[in-house]
Amino acid sequence: MPTWRYSVELEPERTAKASLRDVSMSYKLTVETLRLIKGKSIEEARRILTEIAEMKRSVPLKRYNKKVGHRSDVPGPGRYPVKVAKNLLKLLDNLENNAEFKGLNVENLRIVHAAAHKGMKIRNYLPRAFGRATPYYDQLVHVEIIAREVE
């Protein structure tokens, strides 16, 4: 069994952690969405992700934005990563439950660390004409979030 670690170790008595491992969703859109919710409270992050899942708010793309159309609610290119938002909402629920278990005040938590890491690639094949086959890959993603209690 592999052991999972977090890429950052913060003070354990004032922080709550949660992670998703080997999730099939877009790595690039996950990075952009995590950039949007970092530094926010859990309730504010939940509201933002719910709006993204309902396609009422788009995620501004800062890094992975080649050939992407502009959106009216953000300055510049943006997308609506619904699958990413739904998975991150589950992760926020997990983070909140972990904080309650540790006895932290959930209203005073701020997301101080949010990171996505590339996981394993799953190779599949698409049959083509004349007996050929084309491989295509599914990139899995690891996500970790750490929230700290702020006075």
Curated annotation (Swiss-Prot):
It comes from Thermofilum pendens (strain DSM 2475 / Hrk 5). The lineage of its organism: Archaea, Thermoproteota, Thermoprotei, Thermofilales, Thermofilaceae. This protein binds specifically to 23S rRNA. It makes multiple contacts with different domains of the 23S rRNA in the assembled 50S subunit and ribosome. The globular domain of the protein is located near the polypeptide exit tunnel on the outside of the subunit, while an extended beta-hairpin is found that lines the wall of the exit tunnel in the center of the 70S ribosome. Part of the 50S ribosomal subunit. The gene is rpl22. The keyword Disulfide bond does not apply. GO terms for cellular component: cytosolic large ribosomal subunit. It comes from the Archaea. NCBIfam families: PRK04223.1, uL22_arch_euk. PANTHER family: 60S RIBOSOMAL PROTEIN L17. This is Large ribosomal subunit protein uL22. Pfam families: Ribosomal_L22 (PF00237). Belongs to the universal ribosomal protein uL22 family. Keywords: Ribonucleoprotein, Ribosomal protein, RNA-binding, rRNA-binding. GO terms for molecular function: rRNA binding; structural constituent of ribosome. One of its GO terms (biological process) is cytoplasmic translation.
